[in-house]
Amino acid sequence: MNRREMMATKEEISMVGFALVAYAGDARTAAVHALDAAEAGDFDKANELVEKAQQDINEAHNQQTQLLSQEAGGAEMDVTFIMVHGQDTLMTTMLLIDETRYMIRMFKRIKELENKQ
């Protein structure tokens, strides 16, 4: 394989970046709605939404993994701003999903304590 064949184009990298932003953005929206549902006491809906967020973030992660695999295989990568934005969105949304799961449990515990009174 020549050097050109071992190089992902800027367009390919940007397309992955756009996919990361799209999937992670959908995941972020679902996670925020899950928090809203938990705060309202609708824990079934909250859990459903956090699982949707997880599915969306898994799709984003799959996109990222494909690009990482190419780079690990020797392909050269030019970093694009949209890819940096995509990575940032992916990582912050992964953290948000983890925190959302924790907050759902907190809201549930608060509701249980309120019901004891």
Language-model-detected regions and their locations in the chain:
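Terminal alpha-helical segments
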Residues: 2-117
